[in-house]
Amino acid sequence: MSSEHIQNKLALLPDQPGCYLMKDRQGTIIYVGKAKILKNRVRSYFSGTHDSKTQRLVQEIVDFEYIVTSSNVEALLLEINLIKKHDPRFNIRLKDDKTYPFIKITNERHPRLIITRQVKKDKGKYFGPYPNVYAANEVKRILDRLYPLRKCSTLPNKVCLYYHLGQCLAPCVFDVEASKYKEMQDEIVAFLNGGYKTVKNDLMKKMQEAAENMEFEKAGEFRDQINAIETTMEKQKMTMNDFVDRDVFGYAIDKGWMCVQVFFIRQGKLIERDVSQFPFYNDADEDFLTFIGQFYQKANHIPPKEIYLPDDVDSEAVQAVVPDTKIIVPQRGNKKDLVKLAYKNAKISLNEKFMLLERNEERTVGAVERLGEAMGIPTPSRVEAFDNSNIHGTDPVSAMVTFLDGKPSKNDYRKYKIKTVEGPDDYATMREVIRRRYWRVLKEGLPMPDLILIDGGKGQIDSAKDVLTNELGLDIPVAGLAKDDKHRTSQLLFGDPLEIVPLERNSQEFYLLQRMQDEVHRFAITFHRQLRSKTGFQSILDGIPGVGPGRKKKLLKHFGSMKKLKEASVEEIKEAGVPLNVAEEVHKHITAFNEKAKNTEQK
């Protein structure tokens, strides 16, 4: 739609809260946002200047819709549902759930204690999340020793080892009262909510009583249980002096990016954190609210008893998302320090991201720019590198890889089977490949490279330049990569006459050339091996009576490789679906071939 159409719609926007849906040329919803005042927010996209990522969004907008709500809170809830429904590609996309393990008491007649990563609305009791399965298993192991709930997923018809160990009440054989299960479940809930110290004190009394009664084996069992509680439940530093489950949020923004850190505090301990980074398009606090709304829509993010938020966040809106959780914006003390710590970690995470981006820029785009400067040519943003591969002239192939701004562009890689060259002639092979590649580039109007790299020296470079200039009328810089006696990149040859381009061996531009040469060599060798494997298999079977193209294919499919066929017996060859007499001929032929190869090696 025209910009006039958008301007007309902008003039009609109301001074009310609501959600807006941006659409592209196909009518696809590409972004959903919310606003306290729709008129101001939506108009801001089409006026003033924006950073590059917002500009990319605006360039794709050809239409928009909006929905008025009665409040900002209602707008937040609607936005969450619209994002969930349409999954717009410019909205915050939380990474796939890192599914943390939970301990669960199942809602069954004879309940079990299990570890699960799936949180369902099945009336089971869930505790966690735990930072990893090992930590969850450690806690479960203690509970199994203290509370003998059943272990079997289906009830057997006789007692198992757990019954004899005192870790199961054997409901498969004995009647167990529901009140007994309720008592154990209540104690487990208390234990996991921080009441393990009471359990520990009870065990210490029992241990002392057993020791006084000379029941040393029983006292030893109590001692082991106490040790398990101490090492598992008390080994982590306490972050709070109570046992309330909390999620602590902090966020930082920089260069159009937001990082949100969530600290999971369970039973007073910081057990894990969640880190999310994403570009944001609205006000930071608005996108932060959107993040929280989406965060608790995830099945494995169970809202805790309390959520701590930084200042200037609309706590009323968050409360609407998680109505059963207490929302706190701490003003002082340990709670405030935790929010500050989450912010500090978010800021560090963003700084690290940009430092890594700068380093990556240095080794890619920066290296390409300096390579062009060293060669005296414009920045070679698109480089196409070639390498030939053959063994004594058999199955000659060539390969081309493409690097865009210093990064491999694998969709632009190409393989070539050499058609016109007989025997090992590297120069003629290079001429054929350059001719085929750039004749097609001209014919189909494909992007021209800024630099062609040849794996070789003067002869290969001259062959490529001759075809480009005299046959195709192209003027593309051609350089050669020479290797030392250890087959490592040693120097770059360029110019007329050819000269060594002075590059520091520890420079990023030299490392870039190494990566290009290694990549094209790998690609060519891999293609050549694939070709040899296929043609080698078929050539050995050529001339065997009763083995035509169909049976060659059948043998290839059955054995998969020449090595396996060489090791096969007559009976094994017959299992490939060929008659006995043909299997005998194949075995006889391969045995003779193996003997001949062995004698050749000995000579």
Curated annotation (Swiss-Prot):
Cystine residue pairs: none
Residue stretches making up the UVR domain: 197-232
Principal location class: cytoplasm
Keywords from the UniProt entry: Cytoplasm, DNA damage, DNA excision, DNA repair, Excision nuclease, SOS response
Cited Gene3D superfamilies: 5' to 3' exonuclease, C-terminal subdomain, GIY-YIG endonuclease, UVR domain, UvrC, RNAse H endonuclease domain
CDD domains with a match to the protein in the record: GIY-YIG_UvrC_Cho
Any one Gene Ontology BP term: SOS response
Domain of life: Bacteria
S-adenosyl-L-methionine is among the record's keywords: no
Short name of any one Pfam family annotated for the protein: UvrC_RNaseH_dom
One GO CC annotation: cytoplasm
Single GO molecular function: excinuclease ABC activity
Subcellular location: Cytoplasm
GIY-YIG domain mapped to chain residues: 15-92
Job description of the protein: The UvrABC repair system catalyzes the recognition and processing of DNA lesions. UvrC both incises the 5' and 3' sides of the lesion. The N-terminal half is responsible for the 3' incision and the C-terminal half is responsible for the 5' incision.
NCBIfam families: uvrC
Family that this chain belongs to: Belongs to the UvrC family.
Record's subunit section: Interacts with UvrB in an incision complex.
Protein name: UvrABC system protein C
Organism of origin: Listeria monocytogenes serotype 4a (strain HCC23)
Source lineage: Bacteria, Bacillati, Bacillota, Bacilli, Bacillales
Gene: uvrC
